[in-house]
Amino acid sequence: MKIWTSEHVFDHPWETVTTAAMQKYPNPMNPSVVGVDVLDRHVDPSGKLHSHRLLSTEWGLPSIVKSLIGAARTKTYVQEHSVVDPIRRTMELKSTNISFTNMVSVDERLTYKPHPQDPEKTVLTQEALITVKGVSLSSYLEGLMASTISSNANKGREAMEWVIHKLNAEIEELAASARGSIRTPMAAAAALVDK
């Protein structure tokens, strides 16, 4: 078993980061995620948003893994459960693979919280528990997988910044459109007053 952990600070408020986290896929930084299906989403009586999603991924595999399972590329599935608590301002996301569970399990947990000293920033804490089963080189493979997870975490943070930029651009476009909609009737009204 291998445990991987990481912490990252986003220079954006918690509300922005959690909105982006829910819209992270698809993104150009991690094209291996080829589909996201929402299986269930509801708000509980305490106001927490619960989501259960299925992520479809397609990976090119290292040669040692290809020889073990006999495939060069494979589609895998990951189930993801998240809970957003708007009152405590936390988002916890847990994911686990549901493909190849007889060979490997990857259990990941991400937590998003406002930065304790700066409410305009958000702290992301990530941890993954990796277990390769039934192979004599399991420790080596777990290390390889931890390196892959670390690389993907960096891509994930880049993807979050990409989504945040995209959301901010959409908000600015809507605001500009709204300003234009307001100006047109006001200009027409002003023209009537001038007559």
Swiss-Prot record:
PROSITE patterns linked to this entry: PRELI_MSF1
Gene Ontology cellular component list: mitochondrial intermembrane space
One BP term from GO: phospholipid transport
Top-level taxon of the source organism: Eukaryota
Residue ranges constituting the PRELI/MSF1 domain according to the UniProt record: 1-172
Entry GO MF terms: phosphatidic acid transfer activity
Disulfide bridge map: none
Modification type Phosphoserine: residues: 46, 51
Keywords (A to Z) from UniProt: Phosphoprotein
Family: Belongs to the slowmo family.
Protein name: PRELI domain containing protein 3B
Species annotation: Rattus norvegicus (Rat)
